[in-house]
Regions:
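Active-site-proximal gating segments in proteases and membrane effectors
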Residues: 87-114, 170, 175-183, 208, ...
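Extended, hydrophilic extramembrane loops/domains of integral membrane proteins
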Residues: 126-127, 131-132, 140, 148-163, ...
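Hydrophobic or amphipathic, alpha-helical segments that drive membrane association/targeting
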Residues: 1-108, 158-207, 239-243, 315, ...
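OB-fold (S1/OB) nucleic-acid-binding surfaces
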Residues: 443-470, 506-512
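Structural detector for short beta-strands of small beta-barrel domains
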Residues: 426-446, 488-493
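Short pre-active-site segment immediately N-terminal to the catalytic Zn-binding motif
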Residues: 69-70, 118-134, 205
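Active-site recognition of the HExxH zinc-binding catalytic motif
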Residues: 119, 134-142, 146, 214-218, ...
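Short nucleic-acid-contacting surface segments enriched for D/E, G, S/T with interspersed K/R
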Residues: 423-430, 467-490
Length: 542
């Protein structure tokens, strides 16, 4: 594994820094300007950020997440970490604990000798001892592989390329209007465009590199625990969150806080995860697990979301772990064998079309209006007004598609998860009943979102009022009143890439809270249509 890991790292850095050197050589050859200042400045900023980031993150964790560093870990976990540290010749990491029922785990730091690992109460409540060790082994793998340091070095390239593109564009604005300056400006414009294009490419290479590091961290976790099934179970519960054992509730009752730019077990942006029971009559029922995997392996949206993510899709990680299982005398845990019933590509393009159609119509209206004004053909401005009306109508139709107003059917987390035809655009109106067990961003006092648990699992609830300040006031002063309360929620189930419910109403603690974003959005779209019609009327009155 180490040779492959070194080869992947070397190849990635050769490609990234090769792109950067190419741009610098082109700049020097065509303009004579080395732009070394921009390169040095970007490198210094990134270096300073790298050096102080762990300490700033420590403060953020203490102040905003109430993270307790130095918390006593369970004996089995402490012994496991000590064993790994001894084998890898590394210092015992600084352990942090967040008293929140939502599961999360992540690591940060400079090197393996000053790594921090933070775990939430939900990790201990949802996972068995072997699964907890697998999660921590994954985080230790990041530290042992120097992933924090390598990712910082990789991110330097797109940072410098962006600085070059911006610097060249700013230089063009201050150039004189003579012939030589015009030629220089044209050259700078071409180089700026190339630098920006390479910046975008470099960003995607860095994301790919990050996803690759996750696979290697998984591989290390399997190597350290000799238990691929434990890591698969843990990923299923944290990433999908599928519960793979029957004693979760008993373990949860016995767990308390007293007993127990980071790289996590899964993408923190994708923390809207859920837990679904897969334990039936004393045996693991793989049906729910395979249902959860269908969306990631079949739906085209999943591939798009993964392309823009720092972490691979959970289903792909499970398949990679299954391929490792025979090396440790184990059978593959999941063995996804379902047949794709249809192509979901048509749904993907249909939803994209629905999403961008109002914008295209608006841009068409703006272009037509601009051309007519330039040509002083005011008599044809009605064409632009009609296009504006079309844009408004399409906006209303899009909103009706993204927020179906039909009945909110009673559902379960397990039932919603099994639906492959859903995305950030296509939703399912639903009603869920359960208990609010934590905040969406575990422990964060500024986070207004929740995690709800029903009889089949847990799911993220997206609480989003029209004004940002209203969300933060609710997070600081009202959100805590809903924790550990029985709740009924209504809203729209989505997946982008992980499952969540966009809230419309939430009933908890005998009180009903309504989220007004849907209503405000609807009013604004009708107002848009009224203004578009008024514009058409004004054109005919000219």
């Amino acid at each position: 594994m180490r040779k492959i890991l070194a080869g992947v790292s070397a190849g990635t850095f050769a490609l990234l820094y090769g792109m950067l050197v190419l741009v610098l050589l082109i700049i020097f050859e065509l303009t004579g300007v080395p732009l070394i200042t921009a390169v040095i400045a970007s490198a210094i900023v990134l270096l300073i950020q790298f050096l102080i980031s762990p300490f700033l993150t420590d403060l953020t964790q203490r102040w905003f997440y109430k993270t307790k560093f130095g918390a006593e870990m369970p004996p089995y976990l402490k012994a496991f970490i000590e064993q790994v540290c001894h084998e890898q010749n590394m210092k015992y990491p600084k352990m942090g604990f967040i008293d929140d029922g939502a599961p999360n785990a992540f690591t940060y730091g400079h090197t393996k000798n000053n790594a921090r690992i933070v775990l939430t109460r939900g990790i201990f409540e949802l996972l068995t001892e072997d699964e907890v060790k697998a999660v921590v082994a994954h985080e230790l793998g990041h530290a042992i592989h120097y992933d924090m340091l390598l990712m910082t070095a990789a991110e330097l390239v797109p940072t410098v390329l962006y600085a070059i593109a911006r610097g060249l564009m700013e230089g063009m604005k201050s150039s004189d209007g003579d012939s030589d300056s015009s030629k220089s400006a044209a050259a700078q414009a071409i180089i700026a465009a190339v630098a920006y294009l390479l910046y975008i490419i470099a960003q995607y290479i860095v994301l790919w590199f990050s996803r690759t590091r996750e696979y290697f961290a998984d591989e290390y976790a399997v190597e350290a625990t000799k238990n691929p099934e434990a890591l698969s179970r843990a990923l299923i519960q944290i990433g999908f969150g599928l519960s793979t054992h029957a004693d979760t509730k008993d373990r949860k009752r016995g767990m308390s806080a007293s007993s127990t730019n980071a790289m996590g077990i899964f993408d923190t942006k994708a923390s809207k995860s859920l837990v679904v029971s897969c334990f039936v009559d004393g045996e693991i029922d793989k049906t729910h697990i395979k249902n959860a995997m269908k969306w990631e392996l079949w739906n085209t949206w999943a591939k798009w979301y993964e392309l823009n993510s720092t972490h691979p899709l959970i289903s792909k990680r499970l398949q990679a772990i299954d391929r490792l299982a025979p090396q440790y005398g184990r059978a593959p845990f999941v063995n996804f064998d379902l047949q794709k019933p249809e192509s979901y590509l048509d749904d993907f393009f249909r939803e994209i079309a629905i999403s961008i159609a109002p914008v295209i119509a608006f841009l068409a209206a703006a272009v037509v209006a601009a051309v007519l004004f330039i040509q002083e053909r005011m008599g044809l401005l009605w064409v632009a007004a009609v296009l504006l009306i079309v844009s408004a109508v399409l906006s209303l139709l899009k909103y009706r598609f993204t927020h179906p107003a039909n009945a909110y059917h009673e559902a379960t987390v397990a039932g919603l998860l099994a639906e492959p035809k859903v995305s950030g655009i296509r939703s399912i109106p639903c009603e869920l009943k359960g208990t609010i067990i934590g905040r969406g961003d575990p422990g964060c006092i500024f986070n207004e979102d929740f995690v709800l648990q029903d009889d089949t699992g847990i799911i993220f609830l997206d609480y989003n009022q029209p004004l940002f300040i209203l969300n933060k006031i609710f997070a600081l002063f009202r959100a805590k009143d809903n924790l550990d309360q029985t709740a009924t929620v209504r809203g729209w189930y989505r997946r982008s890439p992980v499952p969540y419910v966009e809230l419309y109403t939430i009933e908890a603690g005998g009180k009903t809270k309504k989220i007004f974003t849907y209503g405000v959005g609807k009013v604004l779209r009708w107002l848009y249509l009224v203004l578009a019609v008024a514009a058409l009327a004004a054109v005919f009155m000219l």
